[in-house]
Amino acid sequence: EKVFNKVIAFSDAEINKFSTASLITRSTNDVQQIQMVTVMMLRMVLYAPILSIGGIVKVVGNGAGMGWVIFIGIAAVVILMGTLMVIAMPKFKVMQTLVDRVNLVSREILTGIPVIRAFGREEREEERFDEANKDLTKNTLFVNRVMTFAMPILMFIMYAISILIEWVAAHKIDAGVLQVGSMTAFITYTMLIIMSFLMLSMMSVMLPRASVAADRIQEIIDTDVTVQDAAGAKKLETPRGVVKYDNVAFAYPGADENVLENISFEAKPGQTTAIIGSTGCGKSTLVQLLPRFYDVTEGSITIDGQDIRDLTMESVRQNIGFVPQKGILFSGTIASNIRFGAPDASDEDVKLAAEIAQASDFIEEKEHGYDSAVAQGGGNVSGGQKQRLAIARAIARKPKILIFDDSFSALDFKTDVAVRKALGEHVNDSTVFIVAQRVSTILSADQILVLDEGTIVGKGTHKELMQTCEEYRQIAESQLSPSEIAASLGTDSERQV
């Protein structure tokens, strides 16, 4: 639970550092390794010392004078297990890394099956998985062979000690200084002692892998979360939703150059701020700074004049409705997905959110309507339907700030227009951000920011930018026909969102 809670608290920077596949392995397989060893320790660690101590007491009391034989046996067991641990420990470390690799490849293949099939790369991906699996199998077989080799040696030591005792005892019996009964008792007690050390040695076989797993888990626990509440952070109370970026710059952790530079603008309630630009110019990064998926490197972002770093993340995010580029759904029902950010939303609120997102038609066509099941990852709905449900989920929260991170890309033009029109009618007091690739999506925005290589090169309405910003004009002319451009310039004042 502690590991999972820490992972949930990670920002995107920490998640990218470990990778999703590695975090899954560490949160499941590594934890299971420690659980298994803990159970074994509870069973053996108490039982084995009792056997060994009891056996030693009896051997000393027996007076057979063969205690040195026992020490030879114990020394042999300790040397053997120490040698095996030295050989196996590095392989255990490699094994967990290879488990990460197999999980990563499996996850990539399973999520990318449509692309793999479309490009006819099934055979290559099978080879890639086979390669990762063979590496893991090879490493696992080596470790298992080493550990399998240990048991015959341990049994050999136990029987060799028994034979040695009988040989020494035979001479003592022949000399008349030892009774047969004492020899039998001594052998029994010696076997108890050796058996207890065998049990402990079996624990030592499991400890290396558990130790590696513990180190990997501890690495997660010891990792500092870069985005967290400051000491004395305040709650964002009854916000109006005025958002201001003041000379913001941002660089990804470990990067040499800023992704964003000198970003300054203000977004007000009831208005739509659109962001457009070429691929990779920092559009999504800009809006992801607002809910603090990352923290700014320089400058500040404020809501109603309060720096978001001085506010609790929970209170900031509770007032934001975020729709990512790729719609993400969870297993459950359509209603539970729409209520994801607003568990107390009424049935009417859920239906209204679906209507605004233009999702109500396909929902009501289903046999069970809003109670229809949603498969893991939304596998039983189309891309457009998934995106509309994601939009409905954000709207149902009734946030003061709405962020659409290229969320209309999966919608056809007609649905795009209908969604924006409904938003203008029902969500007219929120501060709206729209990241877009299509100029047609943002024609009616109150403010358009044009990004180029991480800086704002244009700011204004569509009509203003067509006159003042060369980059925006090139984008518009590449997407719209002359007649569409003329129509858009003539109707700039008729805004929907």
Predicted regions and their residues:
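Helix-loop-helix
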Residues: 54-79, 85-86, 142-216, 220-221
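Pre-NBD coupling/linker segments of ABC/ABC-like ATPases
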Residues: 226-238
